[in-house]
Amino acid sequence: MAEMTQQQRRAPWQPSPTDPTEPTLSARALAKARGTIEDFARSYMPLLGLPVDDVLCFADSLYFVAGSLYELDELNERGGDPSQAPAAAALRQFLAGRGLLDDVQATLDVGFEYWTLERRLIAEWKRPQGDAAHEDELLRCACRASACKSFDYSVLALLVAGLTGRTVSKEMMLFLRACFQLVEIEDDLKDYRKDHEKGAFNVYAAFVRRYGVAAVTKMPLWIAEREQFYLDARAAAGLTDSQLKFHVARNESQGGAGPAMAPEACSGGWALPTPILDERLYATI
């Protein structure tokens, strides 16, 4: 990773004179951010060449950014447009004050794309099924949404790198995003019934809507493609032997996500829930 010069580098704990001063975050959003930051620090900071304890040097920045994203996510769930929210403006102002907005903007845009896709899919899933072409398009949108969903982790990776004067390579970011998506897939499988009841986005639900009971054979084919992408990206990311050992051990200790990431813990393969076929899907929202 390329290093910034000492003159360019800002201490991670230094505030910016342009930091936002108006309150834009709820306690609820900050509480949600806590688990994300802990998992990010323990699972991914060592892959960026940073000790886990270094999170304390810029915890305020991580909490503000992650909390802002959760605030926007809650607005999206209420049907609002996150891109125009005060929390979005404050987040951009915060990043710009640290010279990081240009580095992070494209990844923030992925988040706004995810929220747009999520709103569209939830609305479409309330309606009766359409013809095959229409349903195929919805499934493609759901797969794209799955790839975008963990954009918050990508934002945190770029934030930590920027605050510590590092540049994350394209290959490393592709690898991290592949990791993030497999974890999201595992979460969607575990949360399938709960998400069905809540009317929340779930990529497995998208496969069930399109294929019915055959989703249990169709979705593993798609997951296998994602796992191969992960393995290829991992090979190209330039991990040291110690980083690779850490990464696999962390995956095993977490019990997932899937045999490509945790060969021993997931030796039995992916566990897909029984599809819910009544397809009153999301009609209670």
How should each PLM-predicted stretch be described?
Residues 9, 15-24, 28-31, 207-208, ...:
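P-loop/Walker A phosphate-binding loop and immediately adjacent motor/lid segment at beta-alpha junctions
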Residues 23-47, 54-68, 75-196, 243-248, ...:
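All-alpha helical catalytic cores of prenyl diphosphate-utilizing isoprenoid enzymes
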Residues 170-245:
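Active-site/pore-lining binding-face segments in mid-to-C-terminal subdomains
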Residues 1-23, 92-99, 225-285:
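C-terminal domain/tail detector
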Residues 50-51, 234:
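Flexible helix-coil transition and linker loops at the boundaries of alpha-helical arrays
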